[in-house]
Amino acid sequence: HELKEFHADPHPGNFLVDDDLNLIALDFGCLKKIPNEFYTPYFELVIEENRNDKTKFREILTKLEVIYPEDSEKEIEFLEGLFHELLSIFTKPFQTDNFDFSDESFFQEIVDLGKRLSKDKELRSQNGGRGSKHFIYMNRTFFGLYNLMFDLKSKDILTSKFSPSTIS
């Protein structure tokens, strides 16, 4: 969060851990810089109150280019429902001080949602890709990290340190 840069290909072959437990990136080919105009609204969505405030939520989704000015109210409501559901799952690790990534039910929620969305005809009918170009890297990163943490059966991971509410 301090650098506003991240590694968009998190898998074990791209990192080492030294004797002092420092994480060392080996593959720099997928380092991405996050511009403030994406960073700020993206991480505002981690905050549950912002997702539950319909006006604020719509405003943030518009900033992130998920909702377009020409969208119908029906399209907007569909996208808001979809992103609310997605974010309610993907931000779970940041809603508590510690998170148990070994919890199979959390990972199963992600898998089930992915399967359901891949078959959703209304989603397929949406015009083109939605959202800022930075979404693909952020979502790939979080999915990769969650998958890695699940595979490692990581428990009691301090996630509050990385919540936007603690970042100045």
Language-model-detected regions and their locations in the chain:
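Helix-to-catalytic-loop junction in kinase catalytic cores
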Residues: 1
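Conserved catalytic-loop position in the HRD/HxD motif
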Residues: 4, 9-11
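Hydrophobic residue at the +6 position relative to the catalytic HRD Asp in the kinase catalytic loop
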Residues: 13-17
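Helix-rich C-lobe and terminal helical cap/extension of kinase-like folds
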Residues: 18-168
